[in-house]
């Protein structure tokens, strides 16, 4: 079937609402949301499809200075997203002041030579008046010319349809095949791992979360019983973090497991049996083999 087709990269510094935006577009939870930076590790690809369009949305990790091999992976994911994109959404949140991170991303956009760049003003409801939003747009327009500016509230799903219709103006017509759809389907293991990691980010102390990875050890689905048995391991960098993750009498690991299980049940609409273990891999973010085993690609 011929439809308007294209790839849209959602970019911006950490915690400006990129994950909330893609979740609002898809009307389901596909990208983890937390008040801590680096909560989106992979460039998550999700397909939006309606009667006349098929759009791949790529939710990128936030750009930041690399301090280990995992950080290099994160920044590489951003570069790939820019290269593939037909349209770039630059997200600027009204609850955050402009910073050097914003302008570094703008420079990356300019280096990519992409013409179809849309400024998305997120959390527009936070601004006390329209003048503050206009001033933000004016500041950013000094550095890059945007094709359009859309004010949204992703949390309250305001102007999301307007944004989608604006994006469609910059798409080309192409044949959409089953292969195209299959190509962008995320692996279940990735969704499960990110769901567990979100609960780690939400519940653990600040010194632990970004040294946390999640490995899916076993995944068996019984279609007849609509029952999914999952065994996973939370990977941490230091032995001293293990008691924190497990908690007193196992209280913390139980809390993480119960919350993740509830979330997975809502996503997959099936009975979930989830068992989580804790493993220590010293400095795993510096170990290529471990980083790759957790599903992250390393830039050579």
From Swiss-Prot:
The keyword Kinase does not apply. Residues 122-125 are annotated as: G4. InterPro entries: G_ERA_dom, GTP-bd, GTPase_Era-like, KH_dom-like_a/b, KH_dom_type_2, KH_sf_prok-type, P-loop_NTPase, Small_GTP-bd. GTP binds at residues 12-19, 59-63, 122-125. CDD domains: Era (cd04163), KH-II_Era (cd22534). Keywords: Cell membrane, Cytoplasm, GTP-binding, Membrane, Nucleotide-binding, Ribosome biogenesis, RNA-binding, rRNA-binding. It comes from the Bacteria. Residues 152-154 are annotated as: G5. Its main location: cytoplasm. It is a peripheral membrane protein. An essential GTPase that binds both GDP and GTP, with rapid nucleotide exchange. Plays a role in 16S rRNA processing and 30S ribosomal subunit biogenesis and possibly also in cell cycle regulation and energy metabolism. This is GTPase Era. It comes from Ureaplasma urealyticum serovar 10 (strain ATCC 33699 / Western). The gene is era.
């Amino acid at each position: 079937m011929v439809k308007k087709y294209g790839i849209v990269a959602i970019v911006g510094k950490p915690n400006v609402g990129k994950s909330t935006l893609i979740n609002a577009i898809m009307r389901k939870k596909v990208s983890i949301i937390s008040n801590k930076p680096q909560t989106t590790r992979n460039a998550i690809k999700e397909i939006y499809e309606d009667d006349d369009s098929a759009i791949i949305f790529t939710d990128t990790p936030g750009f930041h200075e690399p301090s280990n091999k995992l950080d290099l992976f994160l920044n590489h994911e951003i570069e790939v997203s820019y290269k593939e994109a037909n349209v770039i959404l630059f997200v600027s949140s009204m609850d955050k002041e402009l910073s050097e991170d914003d302008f570094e991303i703008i420079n990356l956009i300019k280096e990519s030579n992409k013409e179809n760049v849309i400024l998305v003003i997120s959390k527009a409801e936070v601004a006390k008046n329209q003048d503050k939003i206009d001033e933000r747009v004016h500041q950013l327009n000094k550095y890059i010319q945007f094709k359009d500016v859309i004010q949204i509230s992703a949390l309250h799903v305001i102007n999301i349809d307007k944004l989608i219709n604006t994006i469609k103006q910059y798409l080309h017509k192409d044949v959409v095949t089953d292969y195209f759809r299959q190509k962008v389907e995320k692996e279940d293991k990735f969704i499960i791992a990110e769901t567990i990691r979100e609960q780690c980010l939400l519940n653990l102390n600040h010194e632990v979360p970004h040294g946390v990875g999640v490995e899916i050890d076993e995944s068996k689905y019984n279609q007849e019983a609509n029952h999914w048995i999952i065994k996973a391991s939370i990977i941490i960098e230091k032995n001293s973090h293990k008691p924190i993750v497990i908690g007193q009498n196992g209280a913390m690991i139980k809390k993480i497991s119960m919350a993740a299980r509830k979330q997975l049940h809502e996503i997959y609409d099936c009975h979930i049996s989830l068992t989580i273990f804790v493993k220590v891999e010293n400095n795993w973010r510096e170990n290529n083999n471990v980083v790759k085993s957790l599903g992250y690609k390393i830039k050579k």
